[in-house]
């Protein structure tokens, strides 16, 4: 099948199947750097994320597929989340850490009909696949990237599940798998052959939006996405992973577990992830400074996207003391000041 070469963020080439590209373009998609930028009206689409049922193509994410009889036990020993507790059709947020407890990846892990699918940034997927494969050894586990045959679609908004069911009147396209996500959202894992019918159905109830708008929703929900510029920078607690179900302290050993558990038991997390707003652009990995620390780096930007009301919304990790009693600046000690916005969960 023909493919059109496009490029994902951070210059990682990924093939987008030409038939899927055509399906998206028929409903007005404008593709840039390998992802859907928008559907012709970016301002209205950003506004729709706040009040309407929306759907987005998730080509900014890659899917790693884990199969084989040892897939569950293998992942349980590698990842911060409780893999065994994920039900069929369910999902969990999680982190993949170094032995020193720093995250090489954050992800959503789905339990599928034939194993597990890990959704993570395209900028790090190939490296994570290669690293995990090093630890398979004699386990009966296969790790592959099934990008040729599936597409990923995210649904969000008021009464999301009801709107999805109404889109198809109870009769769903062949092979479609549906997963509940954190924050009252759904993820559709769609065989390429069923993608046109799926799009036709959901367009009756959902507003199409760009990839960046879906990422803004995750910023609003306080869900970090580790990308190439932020790898090996944060332990899970710095990114609030234990507050959103991404860390289990009861499951036993996994890579980095000793450091993560010690941090939790000591109760001393000096940096936390906050939601903030800027009137200027920011990018993952941008350094942050604060008045109380002068020229010392106080934190970094994890994710950033254009905000519905203008400017930029972001997830940023900063010193707790700087957040509580100082002013935090972007890139330089006298750079633009961050305006902090409450997250939908408690971090105190």
Please place each PLM-identified region on the residue numbering.
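Intrinsic-disorder/low-complexity, polar/charged segments enriched in Ser/Thr/Lys/Arg/Asp/Glu/Gln
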Residues: 61, 115, 185, 258, ...
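Anionic-ligand-binding alpha/beta catalytic cores of soluble enzymes and soluble regulatory domains
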Residues: 189-277
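Glycine-rich, small/acidic residue-mixed loop/short-helix segments
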Residues: 10-12, 239-247, 261-348
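Acidic, proline/glycine-enriched N-terminal capping motif
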Residues: 2-93, 97-98, 102-104
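Short glycine-/aliphatic-rich beta-strand segments at the starts of folded cytosolic domains
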Residues: 56-77, 144-160, 268-279
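Acidic, low-complexity central loop/insert segments
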Residues: 54-55, 63, 86, 105-221
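Hydrophobic/aromatic-enriched cytosolic interaction surfaces used to assemble or bind macromolecules
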Residues: 12-14, 38, 114, 174-175, ...
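Short amphipathic beta-strand starts and helix->beta connectors
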Residues: 42-51, 90-106, 136-139, 168-176, ...
């Amino acid at each position: 099948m023909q493919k059109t070469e496009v490029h994902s963020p951070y210059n990682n080439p990924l093939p987008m199947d030409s038939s899927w590209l055509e399906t998206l373009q028929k409903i007005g998609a404008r593709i840039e750097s390998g992802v859907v930028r928008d559907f012709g009206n970016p301002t209205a689409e950003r506004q729709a994320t706040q009040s309407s049922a929306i759907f987005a193509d998730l080509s900014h994410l890659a899917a790693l597929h884990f199969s084989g009889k040892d897939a569950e036990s293998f992942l349980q020993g590698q990842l911060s989340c409780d893999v065994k507790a994920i039900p069929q059709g369910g999902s969990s947020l999680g982190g993949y850490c170094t032995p020193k407890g720093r995250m090489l990846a954050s992800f959503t892990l789905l339990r599928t009909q034939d194993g597990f699918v890990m959704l993570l940034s395209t900028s790090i997927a190939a490296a994570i696949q290669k690293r995990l494969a090093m630890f398979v050894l004699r386990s009966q586990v296969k790790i592959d990237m099934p990008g040729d045959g599936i597409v990923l679609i995210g649904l969000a908004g008021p009464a999301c599940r009801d709107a999805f069911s109404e889109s198809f009147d109870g009769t769903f396209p062949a092979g479609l798998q549906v997963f509940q996500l954190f924050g009252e959202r759904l993820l559709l894992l769609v065989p390429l052959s069923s993608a046109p019918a799926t799009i036709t159905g959901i367009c009756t109830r959902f507003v199409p939006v760009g990839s960046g708008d879906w990422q803004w929703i995750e910023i609003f929900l306080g869900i970090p996405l580790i990308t190439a510029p932020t790898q090996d920078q944060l332990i899970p607690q710095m990114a609030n992973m234990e507050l959103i179900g991404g860390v289990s302290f009861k499951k036993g050993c996994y890579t980095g577990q000793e450091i993560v558990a010690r941090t939790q038991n000591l109760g001393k997390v000096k940096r936390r992830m906050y939601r903030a707003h800027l009137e200027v652009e920011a990018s993952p990995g941008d350094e942050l400074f604060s008045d109380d620390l002068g020229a010392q780096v106080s934190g970094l930007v994890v994710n950033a996207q254009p905000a519905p009301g203008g400017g930029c919304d972001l997830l940023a990790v900063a010193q707790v003391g700087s957040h509580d009693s100082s002013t935090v600046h972007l890139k330089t000690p006298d750079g633009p000041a961050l305006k902090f916005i409450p997250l939908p969960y408690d971090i105190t």
